[in-house]
């Protein structure tokens, strides 16, 4: 995982979009925004994922392959949906099994922070955080999606500032 401030240029979202000079963002800074990160130790991620699930009460999981082959005719529409700025009522938890991609989150100053993820990364985006996702130029990512309850992924596009989970999120990060 690598995190840095996004350059905000209006070019292909699958490009790195790293400012020049680069402005790195540390794991501690991500944590201040409520984002959690684990680096899974080896190719056999299952035991580590099971422990994280037990510790954090994640009850359900599934897998998604985000690629032209995996999504077929839905690929372009799904990528557009994933890249629209949104939030969720629940945490978004992803263990990256194969491939690479980018999660962009809004930091405390409402700047975009780009988080490059690859196989072996597990990331938790808190409920209420504005974010988006895209593949990189390899156009392939396979991830395990983890859920506290039923496997549901419902994006709520910005603006959602009046939603209770957005307000709860802002209260938590203000305290950090």
Give the residues covered by each predicted segment.
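Conserved short histidine dyad/triad with adjacent acidic residue
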Residues: 63-89
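N-terminal leader/capping segments at the start of a protein or of a new domain
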Residues: 1-61
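Surface loops and adjacent helix of pleckstrin homology
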Residues: 106-108, 128, 136, 146
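Conserved metal-binding segment of the jelly-roll/cupin
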Residues: 117-137
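Short, conserved beta-strand element in jelly-roll/cupin
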Residues: 87-107, 124
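Double-stranded beta-helix
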Residues: 134-176
């Amino acid at each position: 995982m690598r995190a840095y401030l996004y350059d905000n240029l209006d070019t292909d979202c699958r490009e790195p979009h790293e400012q020049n000079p680069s402005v790195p963002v540390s794991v501690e800074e991500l944590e201040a925004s409520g984002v959690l990160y684990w680096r899974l130790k080896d190719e056999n991620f299952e035991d580590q994922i099971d422990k994280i699930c037990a510790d954090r009460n994640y009850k359900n999981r599934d897998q998604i392959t985000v690629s032209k082959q995996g999504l077929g005719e839905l690929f372009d529409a799904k990528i557009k949906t994933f890249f629209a700025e949104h939030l969720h009522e629940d945490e978004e938890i992803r263990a990256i099994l194969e491939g690479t991609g980018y999660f962009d989150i809004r930091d405390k100053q409402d700047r975009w922070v780009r988080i490059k993820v690859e196989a072996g990364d597990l990331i938790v985006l808190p409920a209420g955080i504005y974010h988006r996702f895209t593949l990189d130029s390899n156009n392939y990512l396979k991830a395990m999606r983890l859920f506290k309850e039923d496997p549901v992924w419902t994006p709520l596009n910005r603006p959602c500032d009046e939603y209770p989970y957005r307000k709860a999120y802002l209260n938590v990060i203000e305290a950090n």
